[in-house]
Amino acid sequence: MLTEHWLAWLYWNPPREAFTLPFIDHPVMWYGICFITGFILGYFIIVPIIALFVNQSKHLSSMDIQDWRSLVNQLKTSSSPLIQKCQNALNRQERQKLNSEIQPLNISSDLKNALLIKLNTILKENSIQRKDLEQAFQGAITSAKQISYFLADRLCWFIVFGTLIGARLGAVFFYDWNYFKSHPLEIFEVWKGGLASHGGALGVMLALFFYTSYIKKWTPTLSFLRVLDFVAIPSALTAVFIRIGNFFNQEIIGTPSAYPWAVLFAQPADGSLPIPRHPVQLYEAFAYLMTFFLLFTLWKKCNTCLAAGTYAGFLFIFNFSSRFLLEFWKANLDSILTNPILQMGQLLSIPFILFGICLVWRKQNWQNLFCCHR
């Protein structure tokens, strides 16, 4: 039966190296290109997501004030109705401090705190948005776009380190501990391969926890679950490119298949026989792509009207449910388990699915999910 479909199968044997860097003579792998492409695209997705959160935020901190001197001068001289409203909100003592700043080069911390309190009081009114204050105090209040780049730049570094460290340790402890316990120094040789997505997910979550603590001094209203939501949508897209990278590397291959769309991997990374198999890497990439479109559509419709953690919850449910099901079409991977009923990837997916259900299964979420519109 296998020979009947021979002409329909894709023979897959691309070079793992895309090119070699000049001068240092170091090969650049297709997997690395896919990995970096996913991160770069994810960065440009996460910036507008953060910008929307900043725009809708009802809190200003010292980070949001770009030029205190300009702010004070405009409060003293501008005839803008909104600025006049801010000025009228000041008490007598605060107005005296404001007017005493003849050359406001070194504005007192007391006056800064007082002005921030008044600006936040006005911002909490339903009719006032952050963009209104940005337009009124031109050049004095940092734009939401600038802040989103500031937050995204730092967030990406946390994600990169969390992904690499978590994915590497996940591969070491979940899949190949028997080897690495005898070769501990090789744990640091990440360039030789050996990354696990579940470990990467745990590493990113831990990194986001540290990021939230780090960023609190600038954005005290930003919670861990909200940051998790920021990362959810680009993570789904990044996962697509990672699986495409696995396809180039001929790793994480599927079980033997006689279907017309089967792929004959000529040089599987695990050294197995070059026979037609399910291109399970592409199955996963497609599933993650559908998750990305679903989350992106939901964000365009509801953005921040859903409770914090909802987008991350959907990501965990859909991505790891897909992973759980598609493991049945994957060739068995070495792991610390002996004669398991389920593969390691399936067992590790279950806690993420349950955590996702906990994040989504909240009453206010279902009300907002079907009522929000743009």
From Swiss-Prot:
Broad class of where this protein is predominantly found: membrane
Protein's UniProt name: Phosphatidylglycerol--prolipoprotein diacylglyceryl transferase
UniProt cross-references to InterPro entries, sorted A to Z: Lgt
Keyword Transmembrane: yes
Gene giving rise to this polypeptide: lgt
Pathway annotation: Protein modification; lipoprotein biosynthesis (diacylglyceryl transfer)
Role description: Catalyzes the transfer of the diacylglyceryl group from phosphatidylglycerol to the sulfhydryl group of the N-terminal cysteine of a prolipoprotein, the first step in the formation of mature lipoproteins.
EC number: 2.5.1.145
Gene Ontology terms describing biological process: lipoprotein biosynthetic process
Tagged with keyword Repeat: no
Residues that hold a 1,2-diacyl-sn-glycero-3-phospho-(1'-sn-glycerol) according to the record: R243
GO molecular function: phosphatidylglycerol-prolipoprotein diacylglyceryl transferase activity
Membrane topology: Multi-pass membrane protein
UniProt xrefs under Pfam families: LGT
Family indicated by similarity: Belongs to the Lgt family.
Subcellular location, record wording: Cell inner membrane
Keywords assigned by UniProt, alphabetized: Cell inner membrane, Cell membrane, Membrane, Transferase, Transmembrane, Transmembrane helix
Transmembrane segments: 33-53, 155-175, 195-215, 222-242, 279-299, 306-326, 341-361
